[in-house]
């Protein structure tokens, strides 16, 4: 199985400019355990059912990146690359392609024309501390939801009330998804000013670790950029949606490709389509 794992600041062997319409497509995917990968393969039909089980059909030729930032830098340094990231993390180092004619934007997620959308969830145990519950109340308040919107994500409660601090004190450890982490850090920054009695630390891993570590008790609050699975909630945790986020399909800025269909994305990531000429001709 020809899998390359990229964990540094990009693919050093790739060419950063030029690109060719007949070049081989460099497929870049996230690692197993990534909530973004889980949502991506589901939304594009890359996950198929075989013998009663769901199977990830991502091509074995895909290079595997272990975080949002590595995915972006890897695509930015390979003119023939294609990958996917949180819409809220998109910047001008890469180009998001239209999907089925719809641009990847917050407005299009809101109006329903851009359909590649997933939830941002926090994960809570049944015995969450008072401090953890206070931070959750902040996230779901008008104050927290405004921070979510201001950072390019879609709030889930536009009619929320203003935050009111409790008497709780202590430390809260939040960990999990590298897609949720950027907006969580913004929330923590603002929360630290709204309530000086509670310290919140953020640890960036992946969605699956966010769930399992909350189950184990090493995280007070987990982060998952996907819905929780039945076997996860059966372990005594629950997911709470704090925001919605699009998944942007990204290519190098030098790429001539500006738009793909859902079927074309599936064909590329399952390895059926391997050359850009099959897309651009």
What do the predicted segments below correspond to?
Residues 4-8:
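C-terminal motif of bacterial Sec signal peptides marking the signal peptidase cleavage site
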């Amino acid at each position: 199985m020809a899998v390359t794992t990229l964990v540094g600041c990009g693919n050093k062997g790739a060419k950063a400019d030029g690109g060719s319409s007949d070049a081989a497509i460099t497929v870049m995917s996230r690692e197993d355990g990534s909530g973004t990968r889980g949502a991506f393969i589901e939304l594009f039909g890359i996950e198929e059912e075989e013998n009663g089980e769901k199977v990830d059909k991502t091509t074995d030729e895909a290079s595997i990146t272990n975080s949002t930032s590595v995915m972006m830098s890897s695509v930015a340094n390979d003119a023939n690359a294609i990958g996917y990231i949180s819409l809220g993390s998109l910047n001008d180092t890469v180009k998001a392609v239209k999907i089925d004619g719809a641009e990847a934007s917050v407005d299009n997620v809101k109006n329903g024309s851009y359909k590649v959308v997933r939830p941002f969830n926090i994960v809570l145990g049944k015995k969450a501390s008072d401090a953890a519950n206070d931070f959750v109340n902040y996230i779901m308040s008008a104050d927290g939801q405004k921070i979510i919107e201001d950072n390019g994500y879609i709030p889930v409660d536009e009619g929320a009330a203003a935050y009111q601090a409790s008497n709780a004190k202590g430390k809260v450890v939040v960990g999990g998804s590298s897609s949720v982490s950027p907006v969580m850090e913004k929330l923590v920054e603002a929360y630290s000013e709204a309530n000086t009695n509670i310290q919140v630390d953020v640890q960036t891993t992946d969605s699956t670790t966010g769930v399992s570590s909350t189950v184990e008790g090493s995280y007070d609050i987990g982060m998952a950029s996907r819905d929780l699975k039945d076997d996860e909630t059966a372990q005594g945790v629950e997911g709470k949606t704090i925001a919605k986020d699009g998944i942007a399909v990204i290519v190098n800025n030098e790429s001539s490709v500006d738009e793909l269909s859902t079927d074309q994305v599936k064909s590329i990531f399952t390895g059926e389509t391997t050359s850009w000429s099959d897309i651009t001709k």
